[in-house]
Amino acid sequence: MLPFLRSELARCQPYHPNPGGTGMAMDILDTNECPYDLPTDLKQTLADRYVEAIASNRYPDGSHTDLKAAIVDYLSEQTAGQWQPGPEHVTVGNGSDELIRSILIATCLGGQGSVLVAEPTFSMYGIVAETLGIPVVRIGRDPQTWEMDLAAAETAITQTEGTPVRLCFVVHPNSPTANPLTEAEKDWLRQVPPQILVVIDEAYFEFSGETLLAELPQHPNWLITRTFSKALRLAAHRVGYGIGDPQLIAALEAIRLPYNLPSVAQLAATLALEARSQLLSAIPRLITERDRLYRKLQVVSQLQVWPSASNFLFLKTQSSSQTAALAAQLKAQGTLVRHTADGLRITIGSPAENERTLAHLQTAITQSLPATV
């Protein structure tokens, strides 16, 4: 290791996207993107606005003024008049990953705190924390329901030895297991003490239809994060946003890098929100496809598959080695899935992609997995 690098970086593991590289056309079902691109008319509108509104020799709007106004309009639909969000409640990041990094810096850096996660969950929480030298406290989940071990969570936040927990990440619904928060889990979050920040990642909110946004004013130690990369079809543009107490948002705005979001990404996200009815109209079709795949896979004796409140399914075989072999065989046939947490996370694709997934799974199972009684 180079002598000027921090020694603990030797233990850090990067996020590994599926490398592909098979030389064949692939169904990309490993990153939970929407299977549908922006419609051609919206792409043309975006191109026109790029020509009209962007001077390439000028930096982007560092305050994200128009985008924040569009986000506030979107949020106002979801609060049902219970409270009125404003731009002071919103921060914007270069993907949710930048928000995660800023949150960790604001709460835990320099030995100020540790971060609590219930695994399996989104791996970037732990990855980013470790790159910053922040301790990660990992608790488990029930292997059948994927609910958090709340007793372990309570022990973690009340322990008095070592670095105190200052930050807790939860995903609603969770990735890779696709389960939404239960009422017991929500009740636990409601009583987390005010010196601990609770980040509720609602990346898949548009699919689950469940949000804790209405409760946000009662919990200044809550922050909700969301993304444009899933339901709003802008993964290529890397836009995430957070909603929280204005004092928390002001701190995150102070930490983030200047001009963090390119002008074209801001235009694309603003346009996506203007056209949200058109873009979100695909969600019922995706949910129908998700439920169809779930029913098909549920009767395969070699698989255990869980219900989903998101745009993906999570399944397991009898052993970790069988699951790894299944992922490799799917890739060899042209279907990329995410092998994680000793299971497979499969994004819901187009009907044609889903049919190929079912066929490829059947072939792989027939070849390598014994039937169970």
Curated annotation (Swiss-Prot):
Descriptive protein name: Histidinol-phosphate aminotransferase
Enzyme Commission designation: 2.6.1.9
Known pathway: Amino-acid biosynthesis; L-histidine biosynthesis; L-histidine from 5-phospho-alpha-D-ribose 1-diphosphate: step 7/9
Database matches in Pfam families: Aminotran_1_2
Protein's gene: hisC
GO biological process: L-histidine biosynthetic process
Cofactor: pyridoxal 5'-phosphate
Keywords noted in UniProt: Amino-acid biosynthesis, Aminotransferase, Histidine biosynthesis, Pyridoxal phosphate, Transferase
Quaternary structure, from the entry: Homodimer.
Residues where N6-(pyridoxal phosphate)lysine is found: 230
Record's catalysed reaction(s): L-histidinol phosphate + 2-oxoglutarate = 3-(imidazol-4-yl)-2-oxopropyl phosphate + L-glutamate
Native source organism of the sequence: Synechococcus elongatus (strain ATCC 33912 / PCC 7942 / FACHB-805) (Anacystis nidulans R2)
The keyword Amino-acid biosynthesis appears for this protein: yes
Family of the protein in this entry: Belongs to the class-II pyridoxal-phosphate-dependent aminotransferase family. Histidinol-phosphate aminotransferase subfamily.
Gene Ontology MF: a single term: histidinol-phosphate transaminase activity
